[in-house]
């Protein structure tokens, strides 16, 4: 095998590799790599593929539990729901592609996460997403959100999987570097969970799906670098998706898996053929030989380098039982898909690539997909000095609250808090006819669990799966450990608000560069916070995604990092979907109560204004230390919620998060068009904290009037703090008595602020 001369320094820069990487590659190969091999190492040793900066931190996550069937390391995690149901789920990012090509970047992010699900043998049943953008006063950010939402809608709607939930937030730190995290859920249709490790020496390797072109070249390396004004030149690194072809791929794959002839399966996502071959080989402890002359190509004259690094979408690689390949390929062709035998499983644990009858690359599989480099970082022994200084901030530094009425309206108009109907109405939320509760109606989405291809019983149709995505990014920016704990706690609380038992999480760690002391400390502390919270709330981690180098180089050469954003996707089990409650009040006369820290607890460190929406509104300064997460209180509140919902005692439940208690209560009135009269105890000087403080494991509930005796009995058996707030009425006024203050708003004004906040800034139509 020849090693043609090339400019090593330029090639290393193109592949995102360091001089030390070159030395290590040469040591492992015992020779200099050729250009195709260097490209393979470039994508497989990128942060996107091998987590070279984060892998040691991820090992601290709890990954085992009684319901965990598949944990980290496979295409998706799988949990046992009982009664024959098994749920596959995962979250992944497509941040950098969406920054330079928002429509295709977001669309192919959806396609990629769906492939992770059905590659396991699961039929996709729902999609969610977590999105972050810069301020909408900048037309660039308006264009980004329009393109991203349209791309998500296009792919999800066309492939026929409902987008049922998610979150959207805005902050200057995301200007130029939006975050697009896509999560998918699927129900297993096969007896055996399909794994990705190659088995059976001599078994054929079969390529299925779309043809291979030059689109998406170097996408994994691109996703592991900072963004700059020159990043628009990287548009060829963004893939182009075809949701209609993916729909056929879903059906064909599930059909093929059910026949038992597929030994292993791997989708071709980041790093394309290179990643799928090397991962299958490394996980199976064997090797794979790949003949590029047999790979279906859509362009002529493609080099080995281009074949190996192409990230053309809707492609899969299978290891098939010898002798069954032709029948299997005929099945795929009936679905209009390309299918070809492109290689075989080898005894030697290496990836051998043939092109034009010659060996174009030969690399040990583990060098690409298992024994990859780990960056060594020194962890700061104390918080960075700038954060310690910010923690000195006191709530007394905020200006006095003179006009709470206008403040609430302004908060409801904030794009992060305002209604996201402009986003949600572009998604088909009801396709498949299993959506029980979707975006905006409750604190978590709920999907009915129907039997899938003989899996599950007819009695299971009363059961459902709930899902949510959460991250208080401002809290994480101020205290990564507390902020990450809060992300897990809020996700579990949101599931409990619909009556679901939290089961497990998938995480998407969106962070700036880990190469600075502060950057690595933020990542390490957030991982610690997630691990602590998952252990405390019994929600193991089944896998996820790490996206680093989320920062933009300004024109003056300085870097603008995003706020650290560890998005937590959590799933839960609903035993009776008939008992699920939404966030809106249901009927006049129902009592309104608050679970969690009481409104008048002025000195409680579980509640605060640091990192709050109110702080940003009135001061524009992000400072202080966010509230402490009380896991014992969280467990108590969530258990009481689930018990009350299961008993049919509650009419509504809505957690207090962005904007604090006043915003949560207002949102319940807006959702129901019902008025409410509330009394919040508190001193006049503590009015700001009473209305707008965040944290405290708090949930506003309404108890059915006819169920009040049963509720009182249940509450008496609990140690959870419960505060009586008021009563729902059929009026058109939202009124709060707080100490000597008596403040009221018309529901029409609240609705107008909440519903017009986002479309007014984008230029779309407001809700009717």
Curated annotation (Swiss-Prot):
InterPro entries: PRibForGlyAmidine_synth_PurL (IPR010074), PurL_linker (IPR041609), PurM-like_C_dom (IPR010918), PurM-like_C_sf (IPR036676), PurM-like_N (IPR016188), PurM-like_N_sf (IPR036921). Mg(2+) 2 binds at residues 116, 267. GO terms for cellular component: cytoplasm. It is found in: Cytoplasm. This is Phosphoribosylformylglycinamidine synthase subunit PurL. It comes from Parasynechococcus marenigrum (strain WH8102). Mg(2+) 1 binds at residues 92, 545. Pathway: Purine metabolism; IMP biosynthesis via de novo pathway; 5-amino-1-(5-phospho-D-ribosyl)imidazole from N(2)-formyl-N(1)-(5-phospho-D-ribosyl)glycinamide: step 1/2.
């Amino acid at each position: 095998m020849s090693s043609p001369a090339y400019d090593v320094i330029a090639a290393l820069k193109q592949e995102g590799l360091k001089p030390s990487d070159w030395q290590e590659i040469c040591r492992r190969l015992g020779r200099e790599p050729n250009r195709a091999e260097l490209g393979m190492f470039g994508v497989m040793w990128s942060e996107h593929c091998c987590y070279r900066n984060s892998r040691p931190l991820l090992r601290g996550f709890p990954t085992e539990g009684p319901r965990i069937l598949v944990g980290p390391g496979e295409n998706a995690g799988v949990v046992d729901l009982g009664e024959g149901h098994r749920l596959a789920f995962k979250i992944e990012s497509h941040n950098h592609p969406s920054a330079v090509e928002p429509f295709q970047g977001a669309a192919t992010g959806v396609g990629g996460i769906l492939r992770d699900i059905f590659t396991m043998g699961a039929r996709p049943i729902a999609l969610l997403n977590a999105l972050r953008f810069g301020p909408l006063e900048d037309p660039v950010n308006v264009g980004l959100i329009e393109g991203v939402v349209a791309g998500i809608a296009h792919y999800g709607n066309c492939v026929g999987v409902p987008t049922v939930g998610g979150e959207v937030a805005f902050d200057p730190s995301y200007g130029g570097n939006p975050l697009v995290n896509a999560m998918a859920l699927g129900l297993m249709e096969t007896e055996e969970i399909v794994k990705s490790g190659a088995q059976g020496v001599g078994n054929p390797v079969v390529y299925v799906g779309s043809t291979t072109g030059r689109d998406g070249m170097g996408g994994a390396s691109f996703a592991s670098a900072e963004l700059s004004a020159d990043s628009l030149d990287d548009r060829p690194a963004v893939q182009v998706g075809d949701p209609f072809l993916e729909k056929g791929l879903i059906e064909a794959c599930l059909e093929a898996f059910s026949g038992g002839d597929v030994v292993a399966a791997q989708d071709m996502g980041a790093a394309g053929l290179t990643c799928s071959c090397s991962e299958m080989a490394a996980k199976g402890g064997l090797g794979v030989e790949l003949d590029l002359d047999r790979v279906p190509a859509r362009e002529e004259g493609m080099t080995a380098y281009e074949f190996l690094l192409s990230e053309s979408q809707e492609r899969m690689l299978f290891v098939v039982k010898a002798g069954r390949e032709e029948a299997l390929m005929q099945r795929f062709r009936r679905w209009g898909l390309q299918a070809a035998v492109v290689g075989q499983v080898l005894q030697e644990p290496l990836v051998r690539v043939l092109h034009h009858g010659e060996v174009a690359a030969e690399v040990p599989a583990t060098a690409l997909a298992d024994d990859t480099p780990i960056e060594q970082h020194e962890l700061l022994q104390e918080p960075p000095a700038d954060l310690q200084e910010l923690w000195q901030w006191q709530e007394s530094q905020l200006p006095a609250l003179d006009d709470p009425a206008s403040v609430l309206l302004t908060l409801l108009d904030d794009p992060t808090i305002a209604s996201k109907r402009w986003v949600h109405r572009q998604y088909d939320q009801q396709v498949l006819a299993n959506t029980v509760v979707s975006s905006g109606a409750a604190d978590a989405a709920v999907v009915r669990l129907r039997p899938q291809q003989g899996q599950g019983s007819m009695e299971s149709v009363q059961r459902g799966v709930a899902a949510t995505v959460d991250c208080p990014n401002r809290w994480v920016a101020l205290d990564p450990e507390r902020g990450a704990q809060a992300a897990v706690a809020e996700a579990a609380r949101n599931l409990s608000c619909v009556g679901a038992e939290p089961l497990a999480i998938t995480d998407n760690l969106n962070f700036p560069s880990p190469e600075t002391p502060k950057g690595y400390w933020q990542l390490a502390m957030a991982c610690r916070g997630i691990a602590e919270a998952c252990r405390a709330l019994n929600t193991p981690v089944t896998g996820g995604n790490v996206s680093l180098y989320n920062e933009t180089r300004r024109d003056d050469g300085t870097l603008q990092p995003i706020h650290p954003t560890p998005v937590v996707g959590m799933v839960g089990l609903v035993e009776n979907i008939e008992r699920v409650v939404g966030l809106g009040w249901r009927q006049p006369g129902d009592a309104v109560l608050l679970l969690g820290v009481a409104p008048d607890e002025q000195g409680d460190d579980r509640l605060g204004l640091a990192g709050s929406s109110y702080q940003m509104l009135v001061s524009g300064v992000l400072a202080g230390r966010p509230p402490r997460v009380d896991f014992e209180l969280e467990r108590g509140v969530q258990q009481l919620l689930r018990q009350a919902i299961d008993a049919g005692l509650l009419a509504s439940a809505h957690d207090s998060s962005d904007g604090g208690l006043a915003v949560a209560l207002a949102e319940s009135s807006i959702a129901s068009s019902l008025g409410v009269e509330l009394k919040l105890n508190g001193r006049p000087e503590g009015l700001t904290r009473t209305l707008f403080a965040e944290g405290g494991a708090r949930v506003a509930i309404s108890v059915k009037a006819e169920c009040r005796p049963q509720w009182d009995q249940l509450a008496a058996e609990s140690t959870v703090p419960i505060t009586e707030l008021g009563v729902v009425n059929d009026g058109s006024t939202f009124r709060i008595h707080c100490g000597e203050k008596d403040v009221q708003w018309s529901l029409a004004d609240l609705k107008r602020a909440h519903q017009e906040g986002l479309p007014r800034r984008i230029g779309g139509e407001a809700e009717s």
